[in-house]
């Protein structure tokens, strides 16, 4: 039995009197004029015209050694039932791939953390950066700001004239010395504390000197009076 045949029940005509399927011999084996499509019936490849048809038979067999295709009334319902299952399988595959990617990322993170923990930390690595205050070790204290000689000189000049700065003047000095406003504020606070300590020390030193001098004068005066009394007694 030849695999390609002309079914008289599939005879459909177009509006212009043109047949969908031309006169093709029964024993023709060429694929140029008529091409077989397993799921959508026969179609003309030259004009690309696809004709819908209805077959009274429940099962139509195309070719030997092929599976039977059902073109009955329930085929569209079966397709609708198949679509959700296909979507579910696709969603399952996508979730599995997503879980695999997350697992690989977690393994990479844990590997990097283990490598960081295995790195030895030396004392020189724990030193703080004086400008940024960021260190390599576990100690996160801020480093002390180191000012240059020019910066300290300009700040001392400003402090000599003004013990307290306004915000406008502070911004001007910060821009001129390439420092931040906070650094200027902290420097002036520390300088005022130092100045108060120095003034307190000088006042205590001068006070002690004054008290010591007065005591010496009193002792000298007391000694002079005692000597005068002794001389008066001798004269008598």
Swiss-Prot record:
Sorted UniProt keywords: Developmental protein, DNA-binding, Homeobox, Nucleus, Transcription, Transcription regulation
Domain of life: Eukaryota
Residue ranges: DNA binding: 140-199
Region (Disordered): 198-236
Database matches in SUPFAM superfamilies: Homeodomain-like
Purpose: Sequence-specific transcription factor which is part of a developmental regulatory system that provides cells with specific positional identities on the anterior-posterior axis.
Stated name of the protein: Homeobox protein Hox-C6a
Natural source organism: Takifugu rubripes
Record lineage: Eukaryota, Metazoa, Chordata, Craniata, Vertebrata
């Amino acid at each position: 039995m030849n695999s390609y045949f002309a079914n008289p029940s599939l005879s459909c005509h177009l509006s212009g009197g043109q047949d969908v399927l031309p006169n093709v011999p029964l024993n023709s084996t060429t694929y140029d004029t008529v091409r077989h499509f397993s799921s959508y019936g026969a179609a003309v490849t030259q004009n690309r015209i696809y004709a819908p048809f209805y077959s009274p038979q429940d099962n139509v067999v195309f070719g030997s050694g092929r599976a039977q295709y059902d073109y009955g009334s329930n085929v569209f319902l079966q397709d609708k039932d198949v679509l959700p299952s296909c979507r579910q399988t696709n969603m399952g595959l996508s979730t599995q791939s997503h879980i695999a990617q997350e697992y690989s990322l977690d393994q990479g993170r844990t590997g990097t953390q283990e490598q960081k923990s295995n790195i030895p930390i030396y004392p020189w690595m724990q030193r703080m950066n004086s400008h940024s205050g960021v260190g390599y070790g576990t100690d996160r204290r801020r480093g002390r700001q180191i000012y240059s000689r020019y910066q300290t000189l300009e700040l001392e000049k400003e402090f000599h004239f003004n013990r307290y700065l306004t915000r406008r003047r502070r911004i001007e000095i910060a821009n001129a010395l390439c420092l931040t406003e906070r650094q200027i504020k902290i420097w002036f606070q520390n300088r005022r504390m130092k100045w108060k300590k120095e003034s307190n020390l000088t006042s205590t030193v001068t006070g002690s000197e004054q008290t010591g001098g007065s005591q010496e004068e009193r002792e000298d005066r007391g000694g002079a009076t005692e000597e005068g009394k002794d001389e008066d007694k001798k004269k008598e």
